[in-house]
């Protein structure tokens, strides 16, 4: 295992310690990390392939799902390889530039995902409350604009963070008590005035999470109100089932993120390893569960996946004959 000692004298290198106090369990913790990472890759690639090859799924809700899967894959690539290197080999050394890049991409992807979840909530609102105008409101052009807006919004909101970090001096330890270059974990190492970093990080996070959650909640409240007015029990059950899968994804995505966000800033009595475990949960769990939730709830995706496996088994039987 590598030693972080030389990071005290080399200002261009940081050392990601992992989970303080649980170093002896790093190897065991790598098992769920590896499992979630594998599930993320397999599940989200499956979603992308199924939607791409099934013309009936070329609809706004599934295009938004593809955006979500793409973001989840990119976020996983930004975190899981380094996390496993830390847990398996203690390879926590990371250059300052790589640390800033990881920080930017991780937080930007989280904000992009929040934007896509908001778009999916709006999609359900239009489908349920304005079904006759659905095709005219959510056109291919509008969907493309929403995708671009998600990328631009996440990138622009996070762009100042690397520059705000770059102006700081790290005159003491360069050992980051975390598994990845989380903004506040790096800021805590700096000596000097870190108020601009703290204020900007808090403002950006609350702006995105606060606005998005309010709009998502409003969309689903209006959708639920419209669903309960439906006279057909079958239509009501179908609409509630679709919205239910979306609400599950919202809860999976935002609950650990909010808990981690507020305990990291205000829960000073909470042990450090709890902060870091929660931060890893909200990065690793949603990307792995999103495909499962949508795959189970969406009949078209489920049928397509079963068909692919059945055709694969059929080819295997023919080959053996």
From Swiss-Prot:
Pfam families: 7tm_4. GO terms for molecular function: G protein-coupled receptor activity; olfactory receptor activity. SUPFAM superfamilies: Family A G protein-coupled receptor-like. Keywords: Cell membrane, Disulfide bond, G-protein coupled receptor, Glycoprotein, Membrane, Olfaction, Receptor, Sensory transduction, Transducer, Transmembrane, Transmembrane helix. Its main location: membrane. Glycans are attached at residue 5. CDD domains: 7tmA_OR52P-like. PROSITE patterns: G_PROTEIN_RECEP_F1_1, G_PROTEIN_RECEP_F1_2. It is a multi-pass membrane protein. Residues 1-27, 78-101, 163-198, 261-275 are extracellular. It comes from the Eukaryota. Disulfide bonds join 99-191. It is found in: Cell membrane. Gene3D superfamilies: Rhodopsin 7-helix transmembrane proteins. One of its GO terms (cellular component) is plasma membrane. The chain crosses the membrane at residues 28-48, 57-77, 102-122, 142-162, 199-219, 240-260, 276-296. Residues 49-56, 123-141, 220-239, 297-315 are cytoplasmic. PANTHER family: OLFACTORY RECEPTOR 52P1 (PTHR26450:SF83), OLFACTORY RECEPTOR 56B1-RELATED (PTHR26450). Belongs to the G-protein coupled receptor 1 family. Odorant receptor. This is Olfactory receptor 52P1. It comes from Homo sapiens (Human).
């Amino acid at each position: 295992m590598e030693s972080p000692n030389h990071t005290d004298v080399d200002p261009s290198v940081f050392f990601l310690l992992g989970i303080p106090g649980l170093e002896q369990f790093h190897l065991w913790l790598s098992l769920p990390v590896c499992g979630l990472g594998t599930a993320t890759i397999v599940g989200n690639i499956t979603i992308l392939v199924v939607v791409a090859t099934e013309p009936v799924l070329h609809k706004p809700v599934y295009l938004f799902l593809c955006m979500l899967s793409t973001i989840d894959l990119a976020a996983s690539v930004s975190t899981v390889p380094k996390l496993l290197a830390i847990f398996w080999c203690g390879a926590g050394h990371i250059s300052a530039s790589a640390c800033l890049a990881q920080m930017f991409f991780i937080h930007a992807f989280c904000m992009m995902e929040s934007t896509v979840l908001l778009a999916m909530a709006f999609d359900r609102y239009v489908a349920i409350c304005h079904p006759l105008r659905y095709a005219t409101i959510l056109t291919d052009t509008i969907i493309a604009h929403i995708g671009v807006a998600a990328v631009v919004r996440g990138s622009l909101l996070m762009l100042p963070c690397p520059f705000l970090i770059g102006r700081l001096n790290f005159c003491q330890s360069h050992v980051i008590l975390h598994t990845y270059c989380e903004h506040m974990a790096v800021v805590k190492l700096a000596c000097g005035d870190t108020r601009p970093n703290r204020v900007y990080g808090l403002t950006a996070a609350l702006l995105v999470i606060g606005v998005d959650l309010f709009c998502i909640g409003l969309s689903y409240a209006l959708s639920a109100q419209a669903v309960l007015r439906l006279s057909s029990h079958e239509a009501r059950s179908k609409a509630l089932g679709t919205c239910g899968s979306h609400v599950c994804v919202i809860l999976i995505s935002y609950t650990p993120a909010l808990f981690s966000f507020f305990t990291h800033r205000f829960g000073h009595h909470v042990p450090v390893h709890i902060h870091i475990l929660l931060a890893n949960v909200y990065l690793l769990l949603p990307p792995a569960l999103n495909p499962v939730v949508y795959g189970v709830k969406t009949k078209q995706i489920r049928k397509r996946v079963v068909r692919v496996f059945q055709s694969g088994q059929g080819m295997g039987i023919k080959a053996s004959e």
